[in-house]
C-alpha cells in the first residue's frame, strides 16, 4: 500500500523555463492551465494551507465546486462537450488542488510559468510513498525464501513491478484520438473496461486500504504494548530477557516464537509467581486481550472527523521513521556482526537453506511493498520535465529496491546464529529486540505516533471511496460514517486478537490488490490498445499473458503457504 502511510501528494501543474527550488510543498500553476485542469471538487472542510492555517472557501465557491462536481459525472474527462463553463469555475485565488490523502492545498499563481517539481523531488516523493509497513516484514520474507533466493526475488519483483508501473504511465499515451492530459488511472480503466473497470478498481483499492488499516492496528497494538512494557519494566527494574530465549551480551536479541511452534508469540510476558504487581499489570496490559481494545477509545473518535487535514501535517514522520529504522539496523549490524552459513537445500540447527519453497510469501509481501501503480500518474504529473518521467521512475524503483535489500540483508545477516536460529526472525523484525532495548523503544514510539496520525487519513480515504460512490456524499450522516468506522475498527481488533501476523496480512492484501493494479490491468490494457492499433504480436501477447498468470498464481499460492 504500497505505501499508504506517507502520502500527502500535490497535484499542481505548470511548464517552467527557469528553475527555482519548489520543494514538495510548493504548489504552483500557470493561469492558462486552469481551464485544462478542471473540474476541482474540494469540500470546504478539506481545505488546508501549506502554512498550516486551516481555511475554508466561501459558500459561493463551495456551491460552484459542487456544480463542477456534477458536470464531471456527466461524461468522461476526455469529452470536452460538458466541460464546466467559465462562470462556474471559482477564481484562481479560490482554487485548491486535491491531495490523495483527503486534504487540499491552495494554488499559487506565478505568471513566470514555473513551479513544477524537479526530478529530485519527484524521485523522493515516489520513494517516500512506497516506504510503508512492508519494510518491517522484509527480513522475515527473506528468511522464508532463503537468503540467496530472497535477494533474487526482491530484485526480480522490483523489475517486474517497475515494468508494470511503466505500462501504467504509458497507458494514457496509447489513446491518440483522446485528450488524456487530465486523466488518472481509474479513468483509463473505465475507458477500456466500462463500469466494471471503475467498480473493480474501487474494490481492489478498498482491499489495499482496509488491509493497510488492519496491519496498522496490529502494529499499533504491538508498539503500544511494548511501550507500556518498557516503562513498567524500567520502573520495577525487571529484565524481560531472563524469561525468554535470547542472546547473552550487551545487545540482546530474543526469539519470541521459541516454544510456540514457530508462530508469532501473542502472549504478553512471564513473571515470577510471587510478583503480584507484575501479575496485575500482565492481566490488564495484554498484547492480544486488552491493548487492541484500548486503541478503540483513542482512534475511533478520530475516524469520525469530517476532515483529516490536521493529521496530514505529520506526514514527515513517515520519512523520519524510515531513516531511523535504517540507522537502527546499521547500528545493530555493526554491534552484532554477520552470522552466515550457506546450505542450498538442507536446513541446519541454526541456519535456513538458501532455496526454500516458501518464497511466494515474500512475493506477496513485495507486491504491496512495490505498490504505487494506482497513484503513479498523479505523482508524475508534477514533474517539471515530463520527458524524464520514465528515468525518474526507474531511479525511484532502484532506490526502493536498494532500501529493501539493505534492511532485509542486514537484519538477516546480523541475526546472531548461533545461539539463535535464523527461523526466529519475526514477521515484525522489531519483535526480535526486547522491550527494554532503548533504541528499539525509540523506533516503536516513532512508528506508533506516525501510524496514529496516518490511520485517520486511511479511514478518510476508505470513506471517500466507498460512501462517495454509494451515496454520492463522503459524509452522508454521522450514522453512516460511524457504522463504516466500526466495521473497519472491528476488523482491526479481531485480527490483532486472533491473527496478529503482519507478514500474513500484508502478503494476502498485497497479492489481492496487486492482482488487479499491478498485473492484470496494465498488461490487459496494453494488449487491447495494441490490438486496436493492429500492432499486437505473438511475443508481446505471450509475455503479457504470462505476467497476468504470474499475478493470479501469486494470489492463489498465498492460501497454500
From Swiss-Prot:
In the record, the effect of residue 453 to A is given as:
Does not affect L-glutamine transport activity
Output the InterPro entries linked to this UniProt entry.
Answer: AA_transpt_TM
Question: Which ranges does the record list as Lumenal topological domains?
Answer: 141-146, 226-283, 335-356, 416-437, 501-507
Q: List residues traversing the bilayer.
A: 120-140, 147-167, 199-225, 284-300, 310-334, 357-377, 395-415, 438-458, 480-500, 508-528, 541-561
Indicate which residues are glycosylated according to the record: 239, 248, 266, 274
Compartments where located:
Lysosome membrane; Late endosome membrane
List cystine links: 255-424
Could you name the Gene Ontology cellular component terms for this entry? FNIP-folliculin RagC/D GAP; late endosome; late endosome membrane; lysosomal membrane; lysosome
Q: Which residues bind arginine?
A: 134
This protein's membrane topology, according to the annotation, is: Multi-pass membrane protein
Q: Where is the composition biased (Basic and acidic residues)?
A: 7-22
Q: Which GO terms describe its molecular function?
A: amino acid transmembrane transporter activity; arginine binding; cholesterol binding; guanyl-nucleotide exchange factor activity; L-amino acid transmembrane transporter activity; L-arginine transmembrane transporter activity; L-asparagine transmembrane transporter activity; L-glutamine transmembrane transporter activity
Which residue ranges are assigned to the Cytoplasmic compartment in the record's topology?
A: 1-119, 168-198, 301-309, 378-394, 459-479, 529-540
Q: Where is this motif: CRAC motif?
A: 457-463
Q: Where is this region: Important for arginine binding and amino acid transport?
A: 129-134
Regulation affecting activity: Amino acid transport activity is increased by sodium and is most active at acidic pH. Transport of L-glutamine, leucine and tyrosine is increased by arginine binding.
Reaction catalysis annotation: L-leucine(in) = L-leucine(out); L-tyrosine(in) = L-tyrosine(out); L-glutamine(out) = L-glutamine(in); L-asparagine(out) = L-asparagine(in)
Q: Name one GO biological process term.
A: positive regulation of TOR signaling
In which residues does the motif CARC motif occur?
Answer: 444-454
Provide the domain comment: The cytosolic N-terminus part of the protein mediates interaction with the Ragulator complex. The cytosolic N-terminus part of the protein destabilizes the LFC and thereby triggers GAP activity of FLCN:FNIP2 toward RRAGC. The cytosolic N-terminus part of the protein mediates interaction with the Rag GTPase heterodimer in a RRAGA GDP-loaded state dependent and upon arginine binding, leading to the GDP release and SLC38A9 dissociation from the activated Rag GTPase heterodimer.
Give the record's family classification.
Belongs to the amino acid/polyamine transporter 2 family. SLC38A9 subfamily.
Question: Assembly state and interactors?
Answer: Associated component of the Ragulator complex (composed of LAMTOR1, LAMTOR2, LAMTOR3, LAMTOR4 and LAMTOR5). Associated component of the Rag GTPases heterodimers (composed of RRAGA, RRAGB, RRAGC and RRAGD); this interaction is independent of the Ragulator complex but depends on the nucleotide loading state of the Rag GTPase heterodimer. Interacts with TM4SF5. Interacts with NPC1; this interaction inhibits cholesterol-mediated mTORC1 activation via its sterol transport activity.
Function of the molecule: Lysosomal amino acid transporter involved in the activation of mTORC1 in response to amino acid levels. Probably acts as an amino acid sensor of the Rag GTPases and Ragulator complexes, 2 complexes involved in amino acid sensing and activation of mTORC1, a signaling complex promoting cell growth in response to growth factors, energy levels, and amino acids. Following activation by amino acids, the Ragulator and Rag GTPases function as a scaffold recruiting mTORC1 to lysosomes where it is in turn activated.
Please give the name of this protein. Answer: Neutral amino acid transporter 9
Q: Which organism is it from?
A: Homo sapiens (Human)
Amino acid at each position: 500500500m504500497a505505501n499508504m502511510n506517507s502520502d500527502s501528494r500535490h497535484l499542481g501543474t505548470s511548464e517552467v523555463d527557469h528553475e527555482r527550488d519548489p520543494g514538495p510543498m510548493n504548489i504552483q500553476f500557470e493561469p492558462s492551465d486552469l481551464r485544462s485542469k478542471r473540474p476541482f471538487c474540494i469540500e470546504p472542510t478539506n481545505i488546508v494551507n501549506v502554512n498550516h492555517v486551516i481555511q475554508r472557501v466561501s459558500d459561493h465557491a463551495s456551491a460552484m465546486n459542487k456544480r463542477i462536481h456534477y458536470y464531471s459525472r456527466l461524461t468522461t474527462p476526455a469529452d470536452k462537450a460538458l466541460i464546466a463553463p467559465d462562470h462556474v469555475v471559482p477564481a484562481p485565488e479560490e482554487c485548491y488542488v486535491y491531495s490523495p490523502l483527503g486534504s487540499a492545498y491552495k494554488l499559487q499563481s506565478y505568471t513566470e510559468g514555473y513551479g513544477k517539481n524537479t526530478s529530485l523531488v519527484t524521485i523522493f516523493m515516489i520513494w517516500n510513498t512506497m516506504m510503508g509497513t512492508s519494510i518491517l516484514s522484509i527480513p522475515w520474507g527473506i528468511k522464508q525464501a532463503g537468503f540467496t533466493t530472497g535477494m533474487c526475488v526482491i530484485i526480480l519483483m522490483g523489475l517486474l513491478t517497475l515494468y508494470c508501473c511503466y505500462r501504467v504511465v504509458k497507458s494514457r499515451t496509447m489513446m491518440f484520438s483522446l485528450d488524456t492530459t487530465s486523466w488518472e488511472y481509474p479513468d483509463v480503466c473505465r475507458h477500456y473496461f466500462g463500469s466494471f473497470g471503475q467498480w473493480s478498481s474501487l474494490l481492489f483499492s478498498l482491499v489495499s486500504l482496509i488491509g493497510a488499516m488492519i496491519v496498522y492496528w496490529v502494529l499499533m497494538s504491538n508498539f503500544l504494548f511494548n511501550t507500556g512494557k518498557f516503562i513498567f519494566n524500567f520502573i520495577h527494574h525487571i529484565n524481560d530477557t531472563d524469561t525468554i530465549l535470547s542472546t547473552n551480551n550487551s545487545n540482546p536479541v530474543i526469539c519470541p516464537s521459541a516454544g510456540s511452534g514457530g508462530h508469532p508469540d501473542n502472549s504478553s510476558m512471564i513473571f515470577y509467581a510471587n510478583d503480584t504487581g507484575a501479575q496485575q499489570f500482565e492481566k490488564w496490559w495484554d498484547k492480544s486481550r486488552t491493548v487492541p481494545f484500548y486503541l478503540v477509545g483513542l482512534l475511533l473518535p478520530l475516524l469520525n472527523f469530517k476532515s483529516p487535514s490536521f493529521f496530514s501535517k505529520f506526514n514527515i514522520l513517515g520519512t523520519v521513521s524510515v531513516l531511523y529504522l535504517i540507522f537502527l539496523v546499521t547500528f545493530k549490524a555493526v554491534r552484532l556482526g554477520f552470522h552466515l552459513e550457506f546450505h542450498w537445500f538442507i536446513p541446519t540447527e541454526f541456519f535456513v537453506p538458501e532455496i526454500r519453497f516458501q518464497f511466494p510469501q515474500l512475493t506477496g509481501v513485495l507486491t504491496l511493498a512495490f505498490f504505487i501503480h494506482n497513484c503513479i500518474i498523479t505523482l508524475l504529473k508534477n514533474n517539471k520535465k515530463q520527458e524524464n518521467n520514465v528515468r525518474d521512475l526507474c531511479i525511484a524503483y532502484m532506490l526502493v529496491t536498494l532500501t529493501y535489500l539493505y534492511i532485509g540483508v542486514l537484519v538477516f545477516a546480523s541475526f546472531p546464529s548461533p545461539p539463535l536460529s535464523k527461523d526466529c526472525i519475526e514477521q515484525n523484525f522489531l519483535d526480535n529486540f526486547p522491550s527494554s532495548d532503548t533504541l528499539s523503544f525509540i523506533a516503536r514510539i516513532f512508528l506508533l505516533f506516525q501510524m496514529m496520525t496516518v490511520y485517520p487519513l486511511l479511514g478518510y480515504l476508505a470513506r471517500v471511496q466507498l460512501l462517495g460512490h454509494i451515496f454520492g456524499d463522503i459524509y452522508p450522516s454521522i450514522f453512516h460514517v460511524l457504522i463504516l468506522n466500526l466495521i473497519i475498527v472491528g476488523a482491526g481488533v479481531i485480527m490483532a486478537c486472533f491473527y496478529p501476523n503482519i507478514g500474513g496480512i500484508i502478503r494476502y492484501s498485497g497479492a489481492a490488490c496487486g492482482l488487479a493494479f499491478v498485473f492484470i490491468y496494465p498488461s490487459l490494457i496494453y494488449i487491447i490498445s495494441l490490438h486496436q492499433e493492429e500492432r499486437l504480436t505473438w511475443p508481446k501477447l505471450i509475455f503479457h499473458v504470462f505476467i497476468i498468470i504470474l499475478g493470479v498464481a501469486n494470489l492463489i499460492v498465498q492460501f497454500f503457504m
